[in-house]
Amino acid sequence: LGFPSADLGPSLDAVCDRLGVNTDHNRPSKRDQLLELGLERLGWHVAAMPRNVVGCEQGVRCGSCGYGCPLGAKRSTMRTWLEDAAAAGARIVVGAKARRVLVRNGAAAGVDAGPVQVRSRAVVVAAGAIETPALLLRSGLRNPNIGRWLRLHPGTGVFGSFDEKVRPWEGTLQARYSDQFRYLDGGYGVKYETVPAHPALLTAALPWEGAASHARLMASLPHLSLIAVIPRDRGSGRVRTGRDGEPVVTYRLADEDARRLRVGVDGAARILAAAGAHEIFTSHARLQRWADGFPDDAYRFGPARGSLYSFHLMGSARMGGSPDLGAVDPAGESWEVRNLVVADGSAFPTASGVNPMITIEAIAHLNAGRLAGRLT
């Protein structure tokens, strides 16, 4: 990252404290019970997932957590940092899209957001790994790293059908995980988690062999469990801007990432088999059933071959020790424009090996303090 890990430690602690990260709200859903059962029977790694929730009921309603916590128990950005900002006097403007950063004498001087014009001594960009590089490019920045090195954690899912009802849309969002294959190829392996499988998610992920087959699979939804296979990708994509200035994304799964994903898919199938699934299949366009191993050529990733999901986006305006290596310096500041700081996942120099939420917020916390020090 370009700074000592000891510098980041206090910010990691501050973020975890503000978000209320704990392992006291980890009652496993039926999905997670099956994940844990399969892992334990195989003798593989399994652990409780730390979660940023306070007062979570860990019951039926928690399955909709990804759509917004109905109880307000999830300590999201809205319930933490935005509340803190508002209490400190910040004005929060919604419905206004930043079109470009205003620059004067080589330094950030504000933001053009169409009907809203902001004048400031510094600008912090935190628009995500797609919109951040697009904003920088629209603002006239030309560092060659802007838009490059986009990582996605391009994952997939493996399904298991059980005799008992799983009701996979219910229960704690994610209570268990496994790092059994996390350290493949120097830390570029996969993680296993479960996710609440609502009908809309399943419709996008299930294989298609025709209307009758699809109807049968959807009717079996109460008996299905899904294991998400989330890799750390070495390959990368790119964000450019079109004629209208909007982002255009290209990404091709690297062969080495596809190979590791295959290992992860086989492992997920073994977990489901050990947990007692009587049918196991992938999210490929052609239904691929697992019977002690998929056919060697059955699980190749290519155009129209299977469903992949971009779990976490990062890296498209990465930090580096010089303009040749990164779009911004280790403090997140642009090499081209003073007091223009990137504070989101696009600043990651490589893909993270875990969910990047805490790391994103910790780097933003650290670099916000550095920026404040320069401005005072």
PLM regions and their residue ranges:
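A glycine-rich dinucleotide-binding beta-alpha-beta segment and adjacent secondary-structure elements
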Residues: 55, 61-67, 99-102, 272, ...
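Glycine- and acidic
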Residues: 18-22, 50, 63-68, 246-255, ...
